[in-house]
C-alpha cells in the first residue's frame, strides 16, 4: 500500500473537538482519464498519537480515537475529544507561529494503518505524519 501526500500538518482548534474523515482510494493512472475505486478497509485498523517531540521517550500528548466508518467505501476517521484538545493546548509551545500568530506548535503525530491477515503476520504502514498546531480560540 502506498500513499501520496502523507505529510499533512494538522491544525487543531482550541475549545472544540477535532475530527478528520478520510476516504482511501485506489487510483489507476495508467489509463486516461484516471479511474479510482474505494479501498476495502475490512480487516484494517488505525492507531495514532501525538508526541511532544520526535525524540525517543518523548511524552505522548494525546492519542487519536480511530474508527473504520464504512469499510466497503474506504472511509475511516481520527478524532480527539475536547479533553484531549485541552491537554494539547496546555502543553503546546508558548511561542506563536511567525506567519499565523493564532497558532502554536503542539507536537508531532503519525497515523498507522494495520491489516490483520488471517494466518499470516499483520502488516502496518504509516499513512499520515506531520506537525500538530493548536489554533488558539477566543470563544469558550
UniProtKB/Swiss-Prot annotation:
Signal peptide span: none
Record flagged with keyword rRNA-binding: no
Record keyword Amino-acid biosynthesis present: no
Subcellular location field: Virion
UniProt keyword annotations, A-Z: Late protein, Viral tail fiber protein, Viral tail protein, Virion
GO CC aspect terms: virus tail, fiber
InterPro entries membership: LtfC/p132/Gp6_b-sand
Family annotation (Pfam families): LtfC
Superkingdom of origin: Viruses
Primary location group: virion
Job of this protein: Forms the collar, into which the side tail fiber protein pb1 is anchored.
Subunit structure: Homododecamer. Interacts with baseplate tube protein p140.
The protein's name in its UniProt record: Collar protein p132
